[in-house]
């Protein structure tokens, strides 16, 4: 269970979101929506434990967070990256992840040679290998339609198996999950803009 009550998050020492209350049970997902700069990434970083809450309470399990960088080890192959992350979290590598994320043909390629879309697929598969709840920031970025469809297929299976996910998106996401519009929770807009300075 991931739950927040009266949560406020900050960026650069200034609150950007406030008054957030939500709960995501096992098997559930929450889609975060809002314009650029509203605080979607700041909220995900707080849920991941990378930044403390500014105010309110937060109950969050250890989760796997995918930001804007892929986090792969460039000298390791695709398969070695997945094996590394699975073992780091005390799990065997699920070989089906290579097929689920269309990485099987790339298994022996060094991660540093992948295209942006291939690297994004590896980043998402790497998180899937951890077996943890997922916090995904723009998960469809750099993915073509076929790759996005594969991700959504895997994500639905993850949720059906009791997994949990929070996803920040700009566009439409073909996922049956409640959405939270962050715009009404924006703290002082001038303070939010100053957080980028």
Regions found by a protein language model. Name each.
Residues 2-4, 17-19:
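Conserved structural motif at the start of ABC-family nucleotide-binding domains
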Residues 92-106, 125:
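Conserved ABC ATPase "signature" region
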Residues 110-119:
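Conserved ABC ATPase signature
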Residues 69, 74-93:
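Q-loop/switch helix immediately C-terminal to the Walker
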Residues 123-124, 162:
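Hydrophobic anchor residue at the start of the ABC signature
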Residues 33-35:
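The feature captures the beta-strand-to-loop junction immediately N-terminal to the Walker
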Residues 48:
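Helix-to-loop junction immediately C-terminal to a conserved catalytic motif
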Residues 138-139:
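Walker B catalytic motif
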């Amino acid at each position: 269970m991931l739950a927040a009550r009266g949560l406020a998050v900050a960026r650069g020492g200034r609150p950007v979101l406030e008054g957030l209350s939500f709960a995501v049970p096992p098997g559930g997902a929450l889609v975060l929506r809002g314009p650029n700069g509203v605080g979607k990434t700041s909220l995900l970083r707080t849920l991941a434990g990378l930044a403390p809450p500014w105010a309110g309470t937060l109950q969050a399990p250890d989760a796997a967070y995918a930001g804007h960088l892929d986090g792969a080890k460039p000298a390791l192959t695709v398969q070695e990256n997945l094996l590394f992350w699975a073992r780091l979290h005390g799990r065997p590598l699920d070989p089906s992840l290579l097929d689920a994320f269309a990485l099987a043909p790339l298994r022996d390629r060094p991660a540093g040679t992948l295209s942006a879309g291939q690297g994004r697929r590896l980043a998402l598969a790497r998180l899937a290998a951890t077996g943890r709840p997922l916090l995904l920031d723009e998960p469809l970025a750099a993915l073509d339609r076929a790759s996005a469809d594969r991700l959504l297929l895997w994500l639905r299976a993850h949720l059906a198996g009791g997994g949990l996910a929070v996803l920040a998106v700009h566009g439409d996401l073909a996922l049956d999950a409640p959405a939270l519009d962050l715009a009404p929770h924006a703290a002082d807009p001038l303070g939010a803009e100053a957080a980028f300075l």
